[in-house]
């Protein structure tokens, strides 16, 4: 998330009126962004604010842990697909520990054992496999993506244990649990969303450039080698850097 914020804060609108090579569908993407932002401001944000205000922090952490644990098979799957065999076994053990000792993931009992949380997904896997980024996309009601990352949305969904909850639980249970997961996710984004609103000259570009930089950061596990940036996305990000730093200091 720090990469998202630092990238977005440094973004200004390009003065060149030509089509952006990383975002050739910008006109359509902006419409999707505006629609999603409207829904967020009028529906999700007020609910998330109430959640943050009235739900105690320890309970929020446990709820977040629970949903992270439900989604963790996706991390394990992509560990192995990327050839990170040791990390895959460590994450498998983390999942087992938190599911059992951690009471279904409500408590992160694995971290004190040295089994730290990782962030892997199918979009990163495709990047590791050498698939080009492709054009930027903004998926309505979901958020920023790229042609390469888009298939990962489906993989993340079907590898989430909540996807299969309907097989052994009624809709009266699955529905509220799903809604709570959406609220939890939005609540975790409240801080970055406020920074976006306060610091970004163009919120759309803030989200886009921050997302692209964050994805590059994740694919290279936080250490991207400059000589490896032959992806058009890197050229675009380089062109998007501001000419000077803000005189008031860096915004984070």
Per-range role (PLM):
Residues 13-15, 40-41:
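Short, solvent-exposed loop/turn elements at domain surfaces
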Residues 69-147:
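Mid-length scaffold segments of soluble, non-membrane domains
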Residues 24-54:
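Post-signal-peptide N-terminal segment of Sec-exported extracytoplasmic proteins
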Residues 1-2:
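Sec-dependent N-terminal signal peptides
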Residues 61:
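A small/polar active-site loop signature that marks catalytic segments
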Residues 8-9:
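N-terminal Sec signal peptide cleavage junction
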Residues 16-19, 129-252:
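A structured, mid-to-C-terminal "fold-capping" secondary-structure block
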Residues 64-66:
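Beta-rich strand-turn-strand
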């Amino acid at each position: 998330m720090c990469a998202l914020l630092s990238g977005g804060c440094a973004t200004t609108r390009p003065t060149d009126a030509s089509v952006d090579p990383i975002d050739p569908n910008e006109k359509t993407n902006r419409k999707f962004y505006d629609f999603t932002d409207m829904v967020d401001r009028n529906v999700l944000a007020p609910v998330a604010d109430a959640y943050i205000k009235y739900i105690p922090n320890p309970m929020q952490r446990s709820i977040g842990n629970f949903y992270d644990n439900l989604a963790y098979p996706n991390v394990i799957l992509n560990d192995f697909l990327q050839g990170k065999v040791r990390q895959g076994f460590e994450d498998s053990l983390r999942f087992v520990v938190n599911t059992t000792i951690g009471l279904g993931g409500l408590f992160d009992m694995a971290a004190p054992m040295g089994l730290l949380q990782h962030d892997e997904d199918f979009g990163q896997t495709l990047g590791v496999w050498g698939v080009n980024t492709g054009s930027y996309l903004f998926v309505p009601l979901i958020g920023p993506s790229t042609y390469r990352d888009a298939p990962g949305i489906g993989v993340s969904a079907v590898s989430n244990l909540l996807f299969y909850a309907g097989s052994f639980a009624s809709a009266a249970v699955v529905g509220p649990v799903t809604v709570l997961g959406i609220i939890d996710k939005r609540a975790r984004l409240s801080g970055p969303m406020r920074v976006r609103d306060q610091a970004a000259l163009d919120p759309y570009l803030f989200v886009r450039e921050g997302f692209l930089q964050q994805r590059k950061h994740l694919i290279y596990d936080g250490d991207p080698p400059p000589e490896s940036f032959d992806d058009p996305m890197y050229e675009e990000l380089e062109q998007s850097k501001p000419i000077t730093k803000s005189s008031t200091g860096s915004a984070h």
